[in-house]
């Protein structure tokens, strides 16, 4: 059912800029175990050559097709493979990178409890809050997950 959309998105990524179609990144999952998350690449290659940086609506690292994909969440579709691999579920807290988890825990130590469940493609926090562009917004989104 999703095959035509996946093929269309992959073709548009390939035509929009140089680089791989899929983007993979280490995230922290269930019980603090690292795993590779898959997404359609929405940014130009070497977007994080200066270190980890969260994206925002004004982010110039995003490709024109990447802007559209992120608005429609099409870039997240390859995460269904993460669900099939058992790394993620459909619904659960969004998985983050260790770099950001370390910062979040300094302000919100209870964040470690998020790793007691499998991370998800979507969550109540994503529905209510959307993407986070800084650590403070990540903490606010987490509060929607934990109902704090």
Task: Locate predicted features.
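A hydrophobic, helix-centered structural microdomain
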Residues: 1-46, 82
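Residue-level detector of functionally special positions within alpha-helical transmembrane segments
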Residues: 2-4, 73, 120
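Glutamine-centric residue-chemistry signal
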Residues: 25, 79, 126-128
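Acidic, Ser/Thr-rich low-complexity segments on the non-lumenal side of membrane proteins
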Residues: 35-67
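A short, structured surface patch at a secondary-structure boundary
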Residues: 55-118
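C-terminal terminal-structure detector
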Residues: 85, 99, 106-148
């Amino acid at each position: 059912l999703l095959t035509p959309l996946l093929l269309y998105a992959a073709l548009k990524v390939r035509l929009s800029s140089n680089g791989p179609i899929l983007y993979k990144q280490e995230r922290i999952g269930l019980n603090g175990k690292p795993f590779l998350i898959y997404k359609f690449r929405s940014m130009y290659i070497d977007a994080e050559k200066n270190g980890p940086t969260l994206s925002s609506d004004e982010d110039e690292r995003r490709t024109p097709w990447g802007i559209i994909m992120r608005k429609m969440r099409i870039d997240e579709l390859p995460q269904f493979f993460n669900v099939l691999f058992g790394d993620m579920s459909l619904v659960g807290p969004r998985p983050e990178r260790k770099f950001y988890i370390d910062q979040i825990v300094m302000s919100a130590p209870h964040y470690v409890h998020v790793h007691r469940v499998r991370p998800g493609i979507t969550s109540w926090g994503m529905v209510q809050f959307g993407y986070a562009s800084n650590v403070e917004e990540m903490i606010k989104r987490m509060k929607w997950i934990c109902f704090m």
